Amino acid sequence: MSHAHGTRIQEHIGDPVSDAPPVSREKLEEIFQDIQADLRFDHELNGCLNCGICTATCPSAHYYDYSPREIVQLLWTENLEGIYDAMQEKIWACAQCYTCAARCPFGNSPGGLVMLMREVAIKHGMESARNVLRPFSRVMLKL
């Protein structure tokens, strides 16, 4: 921040928690294309009425800042920035119980979509994936 005539001017606006550089549009598109290219994608995402049944029945939504409906909407609308943001933390809150899929009137599987997003996060070496998998690294070395 610099001071000009007694006022504070913020020179850089970014994530206050992370010093990571902003993600390019090309990288966001590549991540979404990797999710969309998976053969399971079209089976897991069939449309969305935005009814919220998936979120109302989701155990993780009761305890975390997580909404299966949000995941479906982000992917359905191809909101690249929102998808990337969700891959930083939200997708790791899903318990993979698939209650959302059992209850969805459209036959969507938000849990299945989250699994795809997790796999892509690992493939792209996202920090969120490394943080989640770090505790397992010692176990894997012992196998």
Annotate each language-model stretch with its function.
Residues E44-A61, Q88-N108:
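Cysteine-centered iron-sulfur cluster-binding motifs in ferredoxin-type domains/subunits
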Residues S2-I13, T55-E78:
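Short secondary-structure boundary segments
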Residues P21-L39, Y63-W92, C97, N108-L143:
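Ferredoxin-type iron-sulfur electron-transfer modules in oxidoreductases and energy-metabolism complexes
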Residues M1-N50, C54-T55:
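Flexible, acidic/Gly-rich N-terminal and inter-domain linker regions that tether
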